[in-house]
């Protein structure tokens, strides 16, 4: 059956290899079940509901990828996209999380149309390979920066950013930041020793060390300051809590939003999501070395369609945009080549719903090393960018995309600057003919965005 559905022999793989790859992928991205509730919880959403929604959306999206695209890619709530929803749309724009989810649902429907009409595929193929690699590196730095912030290591200071003063509030913020550094060290050791699931083991070890610190008095829970007990509440998952987010994207009071403002939110999500999703897919395919010599991904159309369906379904369940995860590359590294890898990962996400109380108790300082490590894995692509002086029309746009993402706290801004600079530099140096026509269209749209939005 597996041979008929996934064409294993054609892809030179076996059921055993695919199963191991699927398990590996899940182990390397299971941290999202702890991180996403932490990020979206800042909007007022119930963390258990977010975890269940994230797990179910991950399962659905990954199964779509398995059967529609036959690719070894797993999907879950995208890092960067969840931050955009929590810290920009809700905290920045002042909208409710219900409005944000409805915007995600609608832009998911729009994405389905764009995927069916080949527009997203055309955009993906129009972006030059060097810029794609720059996007992958930039996303890595962005994710690492979020990890440094969540850990408390990176703080707001007179120099815009700085490192925490460990002696101040040592028994709360100080010890959490220190535990993040320790967790990062062990995660790096696990990776160096080529342990499967190194990121997940790093999270668990950091959490255990935190609980030991609480027992010995090094960590003192201070709920009023946002520092809670690190011990989980044991028991069965309360699946009824999913009702707190399920379908809430349709429970919106438009009188408090305004149709014009709502359209702006949808466009913001659409704009960020299309380029964040493409950026992440670029990062996954680049890291997994699945792009062809022209920088194109074979079979991208059904993959984009699966991604789009998962986004709308995830919004109904109660989570931010669902997208392809760069950790899918870990399963590919083990030998995963078909949708069977994704099938195994999807099933494991479904099983994970039984352990929601444990995942929701994992503190942000324990998941921070995972974010920093994922950032490191993506930044490695920078070695594939040619920075020679005779290649500046390619490398400078990639460089601008890299530095813009973490410094402007936006993946889409990095892509915007990368595309605009690529077009302008090639035009100014007489190389305009090599630029894909769609790149000119994108550059104009980005410029108009800066003028009118």
Language-model features: where?
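Residue-level signature of catalytic and energy-coupling elements of molecular machines
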Residues: 19, 39, 123, 197, ...
């Amino acid at each position: 059956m597996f041979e008929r559905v996934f064409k294993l022999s054609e892809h030179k793989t076996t059921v055993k290899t695919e199963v191991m790859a699927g398990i590996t992928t899940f182990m390397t991205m299971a941290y999202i079940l702890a991180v996403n509730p932490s990020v979206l919880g800042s909007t007022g959403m119930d963390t258990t509901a977010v975890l269940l929604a994230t797990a179910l959306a991950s399962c659905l999206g990954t199964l779509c990828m398995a059967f529609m695209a036959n690719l070894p890619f797993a999907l879950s709530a995208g890092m960067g996209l969840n931050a955009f929803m929590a810290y920009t749309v809700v905290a920045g724009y002042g909208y409710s999380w219900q409005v944000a989810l409805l915007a995600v649902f609608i832009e998911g429907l729009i994405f389905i149309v764009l995927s069916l009409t080949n527009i997203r595929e055309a955009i993906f193929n129009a972006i030059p390979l060097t810029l794609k690699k720059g996007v992958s590196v930039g996303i890595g730095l962005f994710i690492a920066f979020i990890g440094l912030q969540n850990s408390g290591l990176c703080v707001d200071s007179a120099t815009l950013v700085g490192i925490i003063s460990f002696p101040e509030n040592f028994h709360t913020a100080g010890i959490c930041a220190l535990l993040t550094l320790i967790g990062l060290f062990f995660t790096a050791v696990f990776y160096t020793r080529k342990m499967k699931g190194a990121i997940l083991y790093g999270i668990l070890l950091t959490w255990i060390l935190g609980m030991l610190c609480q027992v010995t008095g090094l960590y003192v829970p201070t709920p009023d300051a946002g520092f809670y007990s690190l011990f989980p509440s044991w028991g069965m998952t309360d699946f009824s809590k999913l009702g707190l987010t399920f379908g809430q994207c349709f429970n919106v009071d438009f009188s408090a939003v305004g149709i014009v403002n709502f359209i702006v939110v949808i466009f913001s999500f659409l704009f960020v999501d299309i380029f964040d999703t493409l950026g992440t897919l670029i990062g996954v395919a680049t890291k997994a070395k699945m792009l062809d010599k022209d920088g194109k991904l074979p079979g991208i159309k059904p993959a984009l369609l699966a991604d789009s369906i998962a986004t709308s379904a995830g919004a109904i369940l109660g989570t931010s945009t669902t997208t392809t995860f760069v950790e899918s590359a870990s399963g590919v590294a083990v030998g995963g080549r078909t949708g069977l890898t994704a099938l195994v990962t999807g099933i494991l996400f479904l099983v994970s719903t039984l352990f929601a109380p444990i995942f929701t108790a994992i503190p942000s300082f324990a998941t921070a090393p995972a974010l920093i490590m994922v950032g490191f894995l993506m930044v490695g692509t920078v070695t594939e960018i040619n920075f020679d002086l005779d290649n500046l029309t390619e490398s400078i746009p990639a460089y601008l995309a890299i530095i813009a993402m973490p410094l402007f706290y936006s993946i889409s801004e990095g892509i915007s600057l990368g595309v605009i600079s690529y077009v302008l530099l090639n035009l100014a140096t007489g190389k305009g003919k090599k630029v894909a026509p769609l790149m000119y269209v994108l550059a104009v749209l980005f410029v108009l965005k800066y003028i009118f939005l």
